């Protein structure tokens, strides 16, 4: 379902406990206010138009602007203030996801159980 925004429209494509995936349409000159996501990464992938993503670094000391065209993307780290604005009418995908899982996010126990059962059945 599409929702109207001051800057255009957004449509929720997929939501799970781990990600939120939105399609956004931003009118030329449309922009979102400065904000941050405390624990989520924010990724923008542009399919048409041009989107400028402004990220505030070093407690506002530096504003990093990335202008994205079709098939280009960028990410914003958790806790970074950012905003976006459309240089031209833009369609993009916006993805939110939590801090990356640790590399050791899977613990297997079946191997030990299987080996123990094999050894005790002899």
Label each residue range with its predicted role.
Residues 31, 50-52, 73, 81, ...:
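Structural motif
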Residues 21-25, 43, 65, 73-75:
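Conserved hydrophobic/aromatic beta-strand scaffold that supports enzyme active sites
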Residues 39-58:
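Glycine- and acidic-residue-biased ligand/ion/polar-headgroup-sensing regions
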Residues 57-81:
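Short acidic-glycine-tyrosine-enriched beta hairpin
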Residues 30, 39-40, 80, 88-89, ...:
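A generic "binding-loop/recognition-motif" signal
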Residues 1-36, 40:
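A short glycine-rich, His/Asp/Glu-containing loop-to-beta-strand
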Residues 3, 85-122:
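Double-stranded beta-helix
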